[in-house]
């Protein structure tokens, strides 16, 4: 079909000869309809109501041909400007990006399809495409999506396909499970009913549903999950450093002096990996590095649990981090919850520990397993917990730049002077960390820096928040910079949140929290030889990466402010890796009781 785009008169003549129904005819958009076919010329970005509950929007000048096909719409798009690279269309709010073929400058066209009925937001155990599912029969969920709204729309049946490969799934073959037609309106926590699954197995799945008129929807976009390890699958051993903390002297608590430890293990690969996954459990927080690169963007992992009886493991896909030749897996452990008094075991020292197992499948067909044991190397890092991780004594971190060792997590680093890791025994239950991780989800910029007394500066971050504080620093070797955090302007370090940065030989450095966090709005800084600039400072609000499922807005500003304040309070107060009630204490988990006060 060719739609003229030169003049209104040509458009009228065209529609008249073709017996089209004119929907709109203006200098902004022209649209006609014949049966279930639509032709639309957008002279400017905009939206048009095509009738029968159908709206179409575009962000560019474009020609669109729309035809209903079964439960979907075929869409052809032409570029009247001969130079556009892509266009974003939205059919009843469902957006699709359409890219024009590269290299074609005249009359370039593109095609896509938007289904009127299609499941979306597929989840396995409440997560999207999760890694490390340690449930033999995972539960699957989805939502019913429709581009055309109508009363009484509902699901009357569903069919789930689960395959061992994406190719099989694309061919509509569920070799692991084909549920067949199940007459049910249920779409939440449908228990997997296929062949038994094994540790580390990848599962690809999709679903479709039947509506109130017994019409099948389109298949959902594919989703996947990877199985985790079960108790019998672990071949690794718990490791830690030999350094012990003296938690009390003469029956009194003393501050921690044990550095957060580093661990590393080198190994060789003769071939590129076809698949590679690593499971890391830790008592205390951890950061994982492979060949010098931090794996993932999660922070303060894994989730908090009672280490008297349990430890959580994280699952990481490390295929893209490995190479042929020498590789290294490196860990940075945070003391944190490992020394929390209520989580201690009599048969386990109060030190951070890790349990690591990597499963690597090479392109040659060979399999490689790397496990934590006494062949790993360990060394103290520059980071040390301040306080002793108990109510009113969480304090902060001390980073001593003089103890840095560049490249400690790279393959070529000389670790001959490092100690061997020590193997420990503990009877904690190891289970997967099946929740959204903590992430840096909001950058906070300071409002002002004030010199409150000679050499003492107070930073106003503009809002009370829970998260990290980051600052670019300059100083002389041996200088110590002290940061004291407070929720109230005139109350210094009310909850004893104190961090320290010590300069080494380098005269520049960056302080940022790593295995602890702060709460507050005001930061008092001592030890600097200059007044800091605002662009040298920033904060990070940290929370679990949950998706917001709703919102609130009305025409009363007071109610909108109450909603925003309540939402912010919730976001900074309920974490999967810690409980933080600003103005109370880190470990309190009774936020709902305190928020109304």
Which residues does each PLM region occupy?
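Hydrophobic, well-ordered secondary-structure elements that form the walls
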Residues: 1
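Non-catalytic terminal regions with compositionally biased, polar/charged low complexity
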Residues: 4-115
């Amino acid at each position: 079909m060719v739609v003229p785009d030169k003049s209104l008169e040509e458009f009228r003549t065209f529609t008249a000869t073709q017996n089209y129904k004119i929907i709109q005819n203006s200098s902004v958009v022209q649209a006609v309809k014949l049966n279930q076919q639509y032709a639309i010329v957008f002279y400017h970005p905009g939206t048009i109501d095509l009738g029968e509950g159908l709206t179409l929007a575009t962000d560019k000048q474009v020609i669109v041909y729309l035809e209903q096909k079964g439960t979907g719409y075929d869409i052809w798009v032409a570029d009247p400007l001969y130079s556009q690279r892509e266009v974003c269309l939205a059919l009843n709010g469902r957006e699709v990006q359409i890219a024009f073929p590269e290299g074609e400058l005249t009359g370039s066209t593109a095609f896509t399809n938007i289904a009127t009925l299609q499941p979306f937001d597929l989840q396995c155990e409440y997560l999207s495409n999760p890694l490390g599912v340690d449930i033999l029969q995972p539960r699957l969920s989805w939502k019913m999506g429709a581009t055309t709204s109508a009363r009484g729309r509902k699901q009357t049946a569903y069919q789930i396909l689960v395959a061992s490969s994406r190719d099989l799934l694309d061919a509509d073959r569920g070799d692991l499970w084909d549920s067949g037609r199940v007459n049910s309106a249920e779409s939440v926590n449908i228990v997997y009913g296929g062949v038994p699954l094994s540790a580390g197995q990848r599962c690809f799945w999709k679903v479709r549903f039947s509506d109130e008129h017994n019409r099948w929807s389109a298949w959902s976009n594919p989703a996947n999950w990877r199985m985790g390890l079960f108790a019998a699958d672990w071949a690794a051993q718990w490791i830690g450093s030999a350094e012990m903390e003296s938690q009390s002297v003469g029956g009194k608590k003393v501050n921690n002096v044990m550095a957060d430890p580093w661990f590393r293990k080198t190994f060789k690969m003769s071939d590129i990996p076809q698949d590679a996954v690593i499971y890391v459990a830790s008592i205390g927080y951890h950061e994982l590095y492979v060949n010098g690169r931090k794996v993932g963007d999660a922070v303060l992992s894994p989730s908090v649990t009672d280490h008297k009886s349990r430890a959580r493991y994280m699952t990481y896909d490390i295929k893209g981090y490995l190479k042929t030749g020498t590789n290294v897996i490196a860990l940075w452990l945070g003391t944190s919850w490992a020394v929390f008094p209520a989580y201690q075991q009599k048969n386990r020292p109060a030190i951070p520990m890790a349990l690591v197992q990597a499963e690597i499948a090479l392109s040659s067909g060979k399999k490689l397993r790397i496990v934590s044991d006494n062949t790993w190397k360990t060394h103290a890092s520059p980071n040390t917990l301040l306080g002793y991780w108990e109510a009113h004594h969480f304090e902060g971190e001390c980073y001593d730049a003089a103890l840095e060792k560049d490249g400690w997590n790279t393959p070529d680093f000389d670790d001959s002077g490092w100690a061997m890791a020590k193997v420990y025994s503990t009877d904690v239950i190891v289970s997967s960390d099946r929740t959204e991780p903590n992430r840096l989800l909001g950058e906070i910029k300071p409002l002002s820096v004030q010199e409150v007394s000679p050499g003492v500066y107070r930073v106003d971050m503009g809002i009370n928040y829970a998260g990290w504080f980051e600052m670019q620093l300059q100083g002389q070797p041996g200088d110590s910079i002290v940061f004291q955090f407070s929720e109230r302007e005139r109350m210094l370090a009310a909850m004893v949140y104190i961090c320290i940065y010590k300069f080494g030989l380098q005269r520049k450095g960056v302080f940022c929290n790593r295995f602890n966090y702060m709460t507050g709005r005001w930061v008092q800084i001592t030890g600097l030889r200059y007044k800091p600039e605002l662009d040298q400072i920033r904060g990070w609000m940290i929370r679990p990466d949950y998706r917001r499922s709703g919102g609130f807005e009305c025409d009363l500003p007071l109610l909108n402010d109450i909603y925003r304040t309540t939402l912010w309070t919730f976001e900074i107060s309920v974490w999967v890796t810690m409980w933080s009630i600003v103005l109370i204490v880190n470990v309190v988990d009774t936020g709902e009781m305190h928020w109304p006060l």
